């Protein structure tokens, strides 16, 4: 892709990756992604905000060459992960006088990952500024969004926040700016769930800090630029809050139909009680969509058959991921079936040790669900409704 002007003197010089379909060998990328790097030309100095993934280094260098960028004074690295920093070693060769501007923790990780010499760094602290002449960069240290060394960079005169991974999302698009806020909301919510949700306690404070800034744009490291910052800031404020919604998410697997019959009955019972239900058959589920669904609900009910003596392996995987993502759910339960015994319920309950939930009485059946099983599911639906009413969310 060619470079594009964001505002006078500020340019997008990154790369689009329409074909990438997985990130960290874990996160599906149904819309591809972008690696956003930004060039800022001041009256005295030129700065580059982040680099791109090593697989796209030629696109970044080509953009800089096409723009006749003969000198870069500062390369600001907001985040040490290689999709942000991976082209840094090459750029330091091409621009031998460039100084890497970042915080001490990021310098430490960059040195470990990329072996960047100590003498190439200028270390900044929270609130420090850097003059480019007629433009000023201000830095905010924001650990655990989503690594411990993350920072944000604010261009004062143009009121642009280069927000690193915060407020962004994976999408490869030829549009420089967000054009469809409804679609952007869904992609950003998915990205938040996959990347940011485990750190919502820290992020809550950063959202409030950013809200106090005069902002014309938020320019993230992934996805198009946001010219209406209030849209994404309000969304984040909702996601990181402690409030939950009158929703139940049901991730499940059914090997011979028994667990699926239970899921269908429970789904109907919850809907009849005015509760929104989102079932996910894990054999066909995009794990990113499941993560997104976990942002809001008050309750999760896990459906599993028993494999040998424990839950189905795909249920184990989904439960492990949910535990790592630490959603703000308040209640959890387990439904499912077994042939001769096992400890599926106990195993799942132990796996949710990072999620502060009240475990509601499970419903397990030997073989096919019978009338007693269906009554147990109705009882579980009533228990969930009661708990939701206590939270005043019905």
Q: Would you name each region that the model predicts?
A:
Residues 3-64, 152-155, 159-163, 259:
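Conserved beta-strand hairpin/beta-sheet module of binuclear metal-dependent hydrolase folds
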Residues 49-51, 72-80, 100-103, 161-164, ...:
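Active-site neighborhood of phospho(di)ester-bond hydrolases with catalytic His/Asp-centered motifs
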Residues 55-101:
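Active-site metal-binding motif and surrounding structural segment of the metallo-beta-lactamase
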Residues 69, 155, 291-295:
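A short, aliphatic-rich alpha-helical micro-motif
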Residues 87, 285-290:
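Short acidic active-site motifs
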Residues 173, 183-218, 223-224, 265-278, ...:
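FMN-binding flavodoxin-like domain, especially the glycine-rich phosphate-binding loop
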């Amino acid at each position: 892709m060619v470079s594009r002007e964001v505002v006078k003197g500020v340019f997008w010089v990154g790369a689009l990756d329409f074909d990438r379909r997985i990130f960290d060998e874990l996160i599906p990328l149904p819309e591809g992604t972008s690696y956003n790097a930004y060039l800022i030309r001041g009256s005295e100095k030129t700065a580059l905000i982040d680099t791109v993934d090593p697989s796209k280094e030629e696109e970044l260098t080509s953009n800089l060459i096409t723009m006749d960028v003969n000198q870069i004074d500062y390369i600001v690295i907001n985040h040490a992960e290689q999709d942000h920093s991976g082209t840094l070693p090459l750029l330091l060769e091409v621009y031998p006088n460039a100084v890497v501007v970042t915080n001490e923790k990021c310098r430490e990780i960059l040195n470990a990952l990329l072996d960047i010499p100590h003498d190439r760094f200028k270390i900044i602290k929270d609130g420090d500024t850097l003059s480019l002449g007629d433009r000023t960069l201000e830095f905010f240290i924001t650990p655990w969004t989503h690594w411990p060394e993350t920072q944000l960079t604010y261009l004062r005169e143009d009121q642009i926040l280069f927000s690193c991974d915060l407020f962004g999302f994976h999408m490869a698009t030829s549009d420089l700016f967000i054009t469809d806020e409804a679609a952007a909301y869904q992609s950003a919510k998915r990205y938040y769930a996959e990347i940011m949700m485990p750190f919502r306690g820290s992020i809550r404070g950063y959202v409030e800090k950013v809200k106090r800034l005069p902002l014309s744009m938020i320019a993230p490291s992934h996805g198009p630029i946001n010219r209406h910052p209030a849209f994404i800031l309000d969304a984040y404020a909702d996601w990181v809050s402690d409030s939950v919604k009158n929703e139940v998410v049901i991730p499940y697997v059914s090997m011979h139909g028994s667990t699926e019959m239970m899921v269908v009955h429970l789904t109907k019972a919850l809907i009849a009680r005015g509760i929104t239900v989102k079932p996910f058959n894990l054999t066909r589920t995009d794990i990113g969509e499941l993560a997104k669904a976990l942002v809001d609900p008050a309750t999760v009910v896990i459906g599993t058959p028993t494999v040998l003596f424990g839950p189905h392996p795909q249920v184990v995987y989904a439960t492990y991921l949910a535990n790592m993502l630490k959603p703000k759910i308040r209640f959890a339960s387990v439904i499912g079936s077994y042939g001769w015994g096992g400890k599926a319920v106990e195993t799942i309950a132990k796996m949710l040790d990072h999620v502060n939930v009240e475990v509601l009485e499970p419903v397990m059946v030997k073989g096919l669900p019978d009338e007693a099983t269906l009554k147990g599911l109705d009882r579980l639906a009533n228990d969930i409704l009661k708990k939701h009413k206590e939270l005043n969310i019905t």
